[in-house]
From Swiss-Prot:
Catalytic activity, as annotated: acetate + ATP = acetyl phosphate + ADP
Gene name per UniProt: ackA
InterPro entries to which the protein is assigned, alphabetical: Ac/propionate_kinase, Aliphatic_acid_kin_short-chain, Aliphatic_acid_kinase_CS, ATPase_NBD
Protein family: Belongs to the acetokinase family.
Subcellular location: Cytoplasm
Organism listed in the record: Bacteroides thetaiotaomicron (strain ATCC 29148 / DSM 2079 / JCM 5827 / CCUG 10774 / NCTC 10582 / VPI-5482 / E50)
The protein, known as: Acetate kinase
Protein backbone atom coordinates (compact mmCIF):
# COMPACT_ATOMS: atom_id res chain seq x y z
CA UNK A 1 0.00 0.00 0.00
CA UNK A 2 1.34 3.43 -0.97
CA UNK A 3 0.29 6.57 0.86
CA UNK A 4 1.09 10.16 -0.05
CA UNK A 5 1.38 12.56 2.89
CA UNK A 6 0.86 16.28 2.23
CA UNK A 7 1.57 19.22 4.52
CA UNK A 8 0.23 22.39 2.91
CA UNK A 9 1.25 25.77 4.25
CA UNK A 10 0.17 29.18 3.00
CA UNK A 11 2.93 29.27 0.35
CA UNK A 12 4.43 25.77 0.56
CA UNK A 13 3.60 22.07 0.14
CA UNK A 14 5.78 19.36 1.69
CA UNK A 15 5.24 15.77 0.62
CA UNK A 16 6.39 12.22 1.38
CA UNK A 17 5.34 9.06 -0.42
CA UNK A 18 5.43 5.96 1.79
CA UNK A 19 5.41 2.30 0.87
CA UNK A 20 3.54 1.06 3.94
CA UNK A 21 4.59 -2.58 3.55
CA UNK A 22 8.11 -1.52 4.58
CA UNK A 23 7.21 1.94 6.02
CA UNK A 24 9.87 3.27 3.70
CA UNK A 25 9.87 6.76 2.18
CA UNK A 26 10.10 6.24 -1.59
CA UNK A 27 9.85 9.90 -2.60
CA UNK A 28 9.96 13.22 -0.79
CA UNK A 29 10.28 16.91 -1.40
CA UNK A 30 8.54 20.23 -1.16
CA UNK A 31 7.34 23.24 -3.07
CA UNK A 32 8.25 26.71 -1.82
CA UNK A 33 7.07 30.22 -2.71
CA UNK A 34 3.63 29.33 -4.12
CA UNK A 35 2.08 32.45 -5.64
CA UNK A 36 5.41 34.29 -5.44
CA UNK A 37 8.28 34.95 -7.83
CA UNK A 38 10.84 32.16 -8.08
CA UNK A 39 8.66 29.23 -6.97
CA UNK A 40 10.33 25.80 -7.14
CA UNK A 41 10.07 22.13 -6.22
CA UNK A 42 12.97 20.67 -4.26
CA UNK A 43 13.07 16.89 -4.20
CA UNK A 44 15.32 14.25 -2.69
CA UNK A 45 16.22 11.40 -5.04
CA UNK A 46 16.46 7.80 -3.72
CA UNK A 47 20.28 8.14 -3.63
CA UNK A 48 19.96 11.19 -1.35
CA UNK A 49 20.79 13.69 -4.09
CA UNK A 50 18.74 16.90 -4.03
CA UNK A 51 17.26 18.42 -7.20
CA UNK A 52 15.60 21.80 -7.64
CA UNK A 53 12.97 22.14 -10.39
CA UNK A 54 11.91 25.72 -11.04
CA UNK A 55 8.38 26.39 -12.24
CA UNK A 56 5.78 29.12 -11.96
CA UNK A 57 3.32 27.83 -9.33
CA UNK A 58 0.56 30.44 -8.86
CA UNK A 59 -1.64 28.32 -6.55
CA UNK A 60 -1.93 25.01 -4.66
CA UNK A 61 -3.75 22.92 -7.30
CA UNK A 62 -0.97 23.55 -9.82
CA UNK A 63 1.51 22.72 -7.04
CA UNK A 64 -0.13 19.38 -6.21
CA UNK A 65 -0.36 18.58 -9.93
CA UNK A 66 3.37 19.33 -10.30
CA UNK A 67 4.17 16.99 -7.38
CA UNK A 68 2.02 14.17 -8.82
CA UNK A 69 3.56 14.58 -12.29
CA UNK A 70 7.04 14.50 -10.74
CA UNK A 71 6.17 11.27 -8.86
CA UNK A 72 5.44 9.51 -12.18
CA UNK A 73 8.00 11.31 -14.36
CA UNK A 74 10.54 9.07 -16.16
CA UNK A 75 13.42 11.13 -14.79
CA UNK A 76 12.51 11.69 -11.12
CA UNK A 77 9.58 9.34 -10.64
CA UNK A 78 9.13 6.80 -7.85
CA UNK A 79 6.00 5.13 -9.26
CA UNK A 80 4.76 4.19 -12.75
CA UNK A 81 1.20 5.46 -12.40
CA UNK A 82 -0.88 7.57 -10.00
CA UNK A 83 -3.15 4.52 -9.56
CA UNK A 84 -0.44 3.12 -7.29
CA UNK A 85 -1.29 5.76 -4.66
CA UNK A 86 -3.95 4.22 -2.39
CA UNK A 87 -4.73 7.31 -0.32
CA UNK A 88 -3.58 10.78 0.66
CA UNK A 89 -3.04 11.79 4.31
CA UNK A 90 -3.08 15.48 5.19
CA UNK A 91 -1.59 17.36 8.09
CA UNK A 92 -4.48 19.55 9.28
CA UNK A 93 -3.51 22.21 11.80
CA UNK A 94 -6.55 23.23 13.87
CA UNK A 95 -9.39 20.79 14.48
CA UNK A 96 -10.89 22.80 17.34
CA UNK A 97 -13.05 20.71 19.68
CA UNK A 98 -14.63 18.85 16.79
CA UNK A 99 -11.78 16.41 16.08
CA UNK A 100 -10.10 14.27 18.70
CA UNK A 101 -8.79 11.70 16.21
CA UNK A 102 -7.90 11.32 12.55
CA UNK A 103 -10.84 11.05 10.12
CA UNK A 104 -11.75 10.19 6.55
CA UNK A 105 -12.36 13.49 4.78
CA UNK A 106 -15.81 14.06 3.33
CA UNK A 107 -18.02 17.10 2.70
CA UNK A 108 -19.34 17.21 6.28
CA UNK A 109 -15.88 16.87 7.86
CA UNK A 110 -14.44 19.58 5.61
CA UNK A 111 -17.27 21.97 6.52
CA UNK A 112 -16.60 21.37 10.23
CA UNK A 113 -12.88 21.92 9.64
CA UNK A 114 -13.53 25.14 7.69
CA UNK A 115 -15.59 26.33 10.67
CA UNK A 116 -12.30 26.34 12.63
CA UNK A 117 -10.66 28.76 10.15
CA UNK A 118 -11.02 31.62 12.65
CA UNK A 119 -8.75 29.74 15.05
CA UNK A 120 -5.96 29.23 12.46
CA UNK A 121 -6.49 31.81 9.70
CA UNK A 122 -3.09 31.17 8.09
CA UNK A 123 -2.94 27.39 8.27
CA UNK A 124 -6.44 25.92 7.94
CA UNK A 125 -7.35 27.54 4.60
CA UNK A 126 -4.00 26.32 3.21
CA UNK A 127 -4.71 22.77 4.44
CA UNK A 128 -8.10 22.92 2.69
CA UNK A 129 -6.48 24.06 -0.55
CA UNK A 130 -4.38 20.89 -0.50
CA UNK A 131 -7.43 18.67 0.01
CA UNK A 132 -9.38 20.45 -2.75
CA UNK A 133 -6.41 20.20 -5.12
CA UNK A 134 -6.21 16.42 -4.66
CA UNK A 135 -10.01 16.12 -5.11
CA UNK A 136 -9.79 18.06 -8.37
CA UNK A 137 -6.98 15.92 -9.81
CA UNK A 138 -7.77 12.49 -8.28
CA UNK A 139 -11.50 12.65 -7.46
CA UNK A 140 -11.79 8.99 -6.40
CA UNK A 141 -8.84 8.73 -4.04
CA UNK A 142 -9.64 8.53 -0.29
CA UNK A 143 -8.20 11.38 1.80
CA UNK A 144 -7.60 11.41 5.56
CA UNK A 145 -7.12 14.38 7.88
CA UNK A 146 -4.72 14.16 10.84
CA UNK A 147 -5.09 17.12 13.20
CA UNK A 148 -2.30 18.87 15.08
CA UNK A 149 -4.69 19.63 17.93
CA UNK A 150 -6.34 16.19 18.23
CA UNK A 151 -3.90 14.54 20.68
CA UNK A 152 -4.43 17.36 23.19
CA UNK A 153 -8.22 16.92 23.25
CA UNK A 154 -7.81 14.66 26.32
CA UNK A 155 -6.73 17.66 28.44
CA UNK A 156 -9.12 18.22 31.38
CA UNK A 157 -11.19 21.41 31.36
CA UNK A 158 -9.29 22.90 34.32
CA UNK A 159 -6.10 22.65 32.22
CA UNK A 160 -7.47 24.01 28.95
CA UNK A 161 -9.71 26.87 30.14
CA UNK A 162 -8.46 30.46 30.42
CA UNK A 163 -9.55 32.45 33.48
CA UNK A 164 -11.50 35.00 31.43
CA UNK A 165 -15.30 35.46 31.22
CA UNK A 166 -16.81 32.05 30.44
CA UNK A 167 -18.85 33.55 27.57
CA UNK A 168 -15.63 33.96 25.58
CA UNK A 169 -15.39 30.18 25.51
CA UNK A 170 -19.08 29.69 24.74
CA UNK A 171 -19.20 32.33 21.99
CA UNK A 172 -15.80 31.95 20.30
CA UNK A 173 -14.23 28.74 21.60
CA UNK A 174 -11.45 30.65 23.36
CA UNK A 175 -9.50 27.96 25.27
CA UNK A 176 -6.16 26.18 25.05
CA UNK A 177 -5.90 23.66 22.19
CA UNK A 178 -2.18 22.95 21.87
CA UNK A 179 -0.25 22.03 18.71
CA UNK A 180 2.50 19.65 17.53
CA UNK A 181 0.05 16.96 18.67
CA UNK A 182 1.03 14.51 15.95
CA UNK A 183 4.68 14.80 17.00
CA UNK A 184 3.92 14.45 20.74
CA UNK A 185 1.73 11.40 20.02
CA UNK A 186 4.34 9.76 17.79
CA UNK A 187 7.31 10.21 20.14
CA UNK A 188 5.40 9.33 23.33
CA UNK A 189 4.28 6.06 21.74
CA UNK A 190 7.67 5.38 20.15
CA UNK A 191 9.64 5.96 23.38
CA UNK A 192 7.59 3.27 25.15
CA UNK A 193 8.38 0.80 22.33
CA UNK A 194 12.04 1.85 22.45
CA UNK A 195 12.28 1.32 26.23
CA UNK A 196 10.03 -1.75 26.21
CA UNK A 197 7.49 -0.32 28.66
CA UNK A 198 3.69 -0.15 28.68
CA UNK A 199 2.42 3.44 28.14
CA UNK A 200 -0.16 2.78 30.86
CA UNK A 201 1.47 3.70 34.16
CA UNK A 202 4.09 5.96 32.54
CA UNK A 203 4.39 9.68 33.28
CA UNK A 204 6.11 11.24 30.27
CA UNK A 205 7.19 14.80 29.46
CA UNK A 206 7.76 15.28 25.72
CA UNK A 207 9.76 18.33 24.60
CA UNK A 208 9.32 19.18 20.91
CA UNK A 209 11.98 21.84 20.48
CA UNK A 210 12.44 23.29 17.00
CA UNK A 211 11.88 26.72 15.48
CA UNK A 212 8.48 26.36 17.13
CA UNK A 213 8.50 24.57 20.46
CA UNK A 214 6.05 22.94 22.83
CA UNK A 215 6.08 20.54 25.77
CA UNK A 216 3.37 18.04 26.68
CA UNK A 217 2.58 16.18 29.90
CA UNK A 218 1.43 12.64 29.11
CA UNK A 219 -0.06 10.17 31.58
CA UNK A 220 -1.04 6.62 30.58
CA UNK A 221 -0.54 7.55 26.92
CA UNK A 222 -2.94 10.52 27.09
CA UNK A 223 -2.09 14.22 27.04
CA UNK A 224 -3.10 16.06 30.23
CA UNK A 225 -1.45 19.42 29.49
CA UNK A 226 0.63 21.22 26.87
CA UNK A 227 2.37 24.58 26.62
CA UNK A 228 0.78 26.04 23.47
CA UNK A 229 -2.67 27.56 23.76
CA UNK A 230 -5.45 28.93 21.56
CA UNK A 231 -2.64 29.63 19.07
CA UNK A 232 0.99 28.44 18.85
CA UNK A 233 2.08 31.70 20.54
CA UNK A 234 1.74 30.52 24.15
CA UNK A 235 4.34 28.67 26.22
CA UNK A 236 8.02 28.34 25.37
CA UNK A 237 10.25 31.02 23.89
CA UNK A 238 10.67 30.09 20.21
CA UNK A 239 12.66 31.14 17.14
CA UNK A 240 10.52 34.20 16.43
CA UNK A 241 7.60 33.79 18.87
CA UNK A 242 7.55 35.31 22.34
CA UNK A 243 5.84 32.45 24.15
CA UNK A 244 4.26 33.38 27.51
CA UNK A 245 3.87 37.12 28.03
CA UNK A 246 1.78 39.24 30.39
CA UNK A 247 -1.37 40.27 28.48
CA UNK A 248 -0.96 43.69 30.10
CA UNK A 249 2.41 44.05 28.38
CA UNK A 250 0.67 43.43 25.06
CA UNK A 251 -1.80 46.31 25.45
CA UNK A 252 0.99 48.52 26.89
CA UNK A 253 3.18 47.96 23.79
CA UNK A 254 0.22 48.52 21.46
CA UNK A 255 -0.43 51.88 23.10
CA UNK A 256 3.21 53.02 23.15
CA UNK A 257 4.00 51.87 19.60
CA UNK A 258 0.62 52.76 18.10
CA UNK A 259 0.09 49.19 16.88
CA UNK A 260 -3.18 47.63 15.75
CA UNK A 261 -4.00 43.91 16.24
CA UNK A 262 -2.14 42.91 13.05
CA UNK A 263 0.89 44.93 14.14
CA UNK A 264 1.12 43.40 17.61
CA UNK A 265 0.47 39.91 16.23
CA UNK A 266 3.35 40.40 13.78
CA UNK A 267 5.64 41.66 16.57
CA UNK A 268 4.89 38.70 18.88
CA UNK A 269 4.85 36.00 16.18
CA UNK A 270 7.60 37.07 13.80
CA UNK A 271 9.95 39.50 15.55
CA UNK A 272 10.19 38.10 19.09
CA UNK A 273 11.68 35.00 20.70
CA UNK A 274 15.32 34.16 20.04
CA UNK A 275 15.45 36.62 17.12
CA UNK A 276 13.93 39.47 19.13
CA UNK A 277 16.26 39.10 22.12
CA UNK A 278 19.51 38.25 20.29
CA UNK A 279 19.05 40.50 17.27
CA UNK A 280 21.14 37.86 15.48
CA UNK A 281 18.88 35.12 14.13
CA UNK A 282 15.96 32.84 14.91
CA UNK A 283 18.17 29.84 14.11
CA UNK A 284 19.70 28.18 17.18
CA UNK A 285 22.82 27.16 15.23
CA UNK A 286 23.57 30.78 14.40
CA UNK A 287 22.72 31.76 17.97
CA UNK A 288 25.25 29.26 19.40
CA UNK A 289 27.93 30.63 17.05
CA UNK A 290 27.17 34.17 18.27
CA UNK A 291 27.35 32.96 21.90
CA UNK A 292 30.77 31.42 21.21
CA UNK A 293 31.88 34.86 19.96
CA UNK A 294 30.80 36.41 23.26
CA UNK A 295 27.69 38.23 21.92
CA UNK A 296 25.95 39.25 25.16
CA UNK A 297 22.43 39.43 23.78
CA UNK A 298 22.84 36.03 22.14
CA UNK A 299 24.00 34.63 25.51
CA UNK A 300 20.93 36.16 27.20
CA UNK A 301 18.61 34.69 24.54
CA UNK A 302 20.15 31.25 25.01
CA UNK A 303 19.76 31.39 28.80
CA UNK A 304 16.12 32.52 28.52
CA UNK A 305 15.36 29.81 25.96
CA UNK A 306 16.71 26.95 28.10
CA UNK A 307 15.28 28.36 31.33
CA UNK A 308 11.73 28.38 29.99
CA UNK A 309 12.00 24.71 28.96
CA UNK A 310 13.42 23.73 32.37
CA UNK A 311 10.65 25.65 34.18
CA UNK A 312 7.89 23.86 32.26
CA UNK A 313 9.47 20.44 32.90
CA UNK A 314 9.27 21.23 36.63
CA UNK A 315 5.66 22.38 36.30
CA UNK A 316 4.63 19.27 34.39
CA UNK A 317 6.39 16.95 36.83
CA UNK A 318 4.13 18.55 39.46
CA UNK A 319 1.02 18.23 37.25
CA UNK A 320 1.80 14.55 36.59
CA UNK A 321 2.68 13.79 40.22
CA UNK A 322 6.19 12.73 39.19
CA UNK A 323 7.94 11.83 35.96
CA UNK A 324 9.34 8.58 34.53
CA UNK A 325 10.56 9.70 31.10
CA UNK A 326 11.72 13.04 29.68
CA UNK A 327 12.00 13.06 25.93
CA UNK A 328 13.63 15.50 23.50
CA UNK A 329 12.58 15.78 19.85
CA UNK A 330 12.34 18.39 17.06
CA UNK A 331 15.21 20.05 15.18
CA UNK A 332 16.89 21.49 18.29
CA UNK A 333 15.86 18.73 20.72
CA UNK A 334 17.25 15.99 18.47
CA UNK A 335 20.44 17.67 17.29
CA UNK A 336 21.74 20.14 19.88
CA UNK A 337 23.29 18.48 22.89
CA UNK A 338 23.89 21.91 24.50
CA UNK A 339 20.15 22.44 24.80
CA UNK A 340 19.55 19.06 26.47
CA UNK A 341 22.54 19.53 28.78
CA UNK A 342 21.49 23.00 29.96
CA UNK A 343 17.86 22.00 30.47
CA UNK A 344 18.74 18.92 32.56
CA UNK A 345 21.52 20.60 34.58
CA UNK A 346 21.00 20.75 38.38
CA UNK A 347 17.88 18.57 38.16
CA UNK A 348 19.28 15.72 40.28
CA UNK A 349 16.79 16.63 43.03
CA UNK A 350 14.07 15.41 40.62
CA UNK A 351 15.93 12.19 39.84
CA UNK A 352 17.29 13.50 36.52
CA UNK A 353 20.94 12.65 35.86
CA UNK A 354 22.31 13.22 32.38
CA UNK A 355 25.29 11.29 31.01
CA UNK A 356 27.07 14.27 29.44
CA UNK A 357 29.51 12.10 27.47
CA UNK A 358 26.75 10.11 25.82
CA UNK A 359 24.58 13.20 25.34
CA UNK A 360 27.36 15.08 23.51
CA UNK A 361 27.53 12.35 20.85
CA UNK A 362 23.81 12.02 20.12
CA UNK A 363 22.45 13.76 17.02
CA UNK A 364 19.17 12.83 15.38
CA UNK A 365 19.10 9.24 16.64
CA UNK A 366 17.15 7.27 19.23
CA UNK A 367 19.19 7.11 22.42
CA UNK A 368 19.02 7.08 26.21
CA UNK A 369 21.14 10.00 27.43
CA UNK A 370 20.62 9.65 31.19
CA UNK A 371 22.99 7.73 33.48
CA UNK A 372 22.27 4.12 34.44
CA UNK A 373 21.34 5.22 37.99
CA UNK A 374 19.11 8.13 36.92
CA UNK A 375 15.57 7.62 38.34
CA UNK A 376 14.17 9.44 35.31
CA UNK A 377 15.00 8.14 31.84
CA UNK A 378 16.06 10.99 29.54
CA UNK A 379 15.70 9.98 25.90
CA UNK A 380 16.14 11.44 22.41
CA UNK A 381 13.58 10.26 19.83
CA UNK A 382 13.57 11.83 16.34
CA UNK A 383 10.00 12.72 15.44
CA UNK A 384 8.27 11.37 12.34
CA UNK A 385 4.94 13.12 11.98
CA UNK A 386 4.59 12.04 8.34
CA UNK A 387 4.94 8.36 9.22
CA UNK A 388 2.22 8.72 11.85
CA UNK A 389 -0.05 10.50 9.33
CA UNK A 390 0.59 7.66 6.85
CA UNK A 391 -0.11 5.01 9.54
CA UNK A 392 -3.35 6.72 10.59
CA UNK A 393 -4.39 6.95 6.94
CA UNK A 394 -3.74 3.24 6.45
CA UNK A 395 -5.65 2.31 9.63
CA UNK A 396 -8.67 4.37 8.55
CA UNK A 397 -8.65 2.79 5.06
CA UNK A 398 -8.68 -0.67 6.63
CA UNK A 399 -11.79 0.22 8.65
Amino acid sequence: MKILVLNCGSSSIKYKLFDMTTKEVIAQGGIEKIGLKGSFLKLTLPNGEKKVLEKDIPEHTIGVEFILNTLISPEYGAIKSLDEINAVGHRMVHGGERFSESVLLNKEVLEAFAACNDLAPLHNPANLKGVNAVSAILPNIPQVGVFDTAFHQTMPDYAYMYAIPYEMYEKYGVRRYGFHGTSHRYVSKRVCEFLGVNPVGQKIITCHIGNGGSIAAIKDGKCIDTTMGLTPLEGLMMGTRSGDIDAGAVTFIMEKEGLNTTGISNLLNKKSGVLGISGVSSDMRELLAACANGNERAILAEKMYYYRIKKYIGAYAAALGGVDIILFTGGVGENQFECRESVCKDMEFMGIKLDNNVNAKVRGEEAIISTADSKVKVVVIPTDEELLIASDTMDILKK
